[in-house]
Amino acid sequence: MVRDTYGGAVDPLEPHPVTGQPSTSPAAPGGGWPGDPATPDTPVARTAVQVRRLAASAADVGELQARISVCRACPRLVRWRESVARDGRRAAFADQPYWGRPGPSFGDPDAEVLVVGLAPAANGTNRTGRMFTGDSSGDFLWAALHRTGFAALPTSVGAGDGQRLDGMRIVAAVRCAPPGNAPTGAERATCAPWLHRDLELSLPRLRTVLCLGGVAWTATLAAARALGWDVPRPAPRFGHAVEVPLRAPSGQVVRLLGCYHVSPHNTFTKRLTAPMLDAVLASLREPR
């Protein structure tokens, strides 16, 4: 066994499935994982107070994602994401290193569209290090993003595969994989400042926030209020293809757009179909 940056025991070096670069599980900051935004010197948030301070002081999208990717403020989530990376890997991925850290955003830092999901999956983003990558939810989403011209490739395998987004960036309401896909209220609140700063840094280019599911919708409305945006009251209810105009203090109007989440629960039951998702994504390109 070797030791990671924080002094914890980790698995020996294993080859990254895309690049072949040796990596530990979890991936050490600055240890060579492709696309890792952090370095060994990136400041680490260990409390909710530190999350607020480090989020607010991040100068740009890159610095913010680096700080997000090393956050350790929620002990339950840290234990879970790292235990999966070390001992709970799915059999199909048992010979692969796992990212095992919070999921940074992925996409265009100057995006006009911000896509907000719920949280990483234990064997998806927590394995690959990229939002909505490595599970069936991601497969459904990336195929649609490619069909509608946002994604360079129809699939997303993992960091280093050449995938890129044009005019779009993907974030999440909670950045760590939670047990049972269910973060607690306290964990959502601790993580919220990261989303707040993601919204701030997206202005003035931001035109639309696309929320995948009700949790993302609620988190985005809360973030907008915290930033002093003009948000309708009572709070607009989430629904598929529901649109709500939000106004930033600068006067800029940002469209909030709802979409059913791309989870298997919705796609297998046909609550969300490929044509439905394509229509929502196509509307992002319509002039406003």
Describe the role of every protein-language-model region.
Residues 6, 13-246, 250-287:
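A polyanion-binding, active-site-adjacent surface
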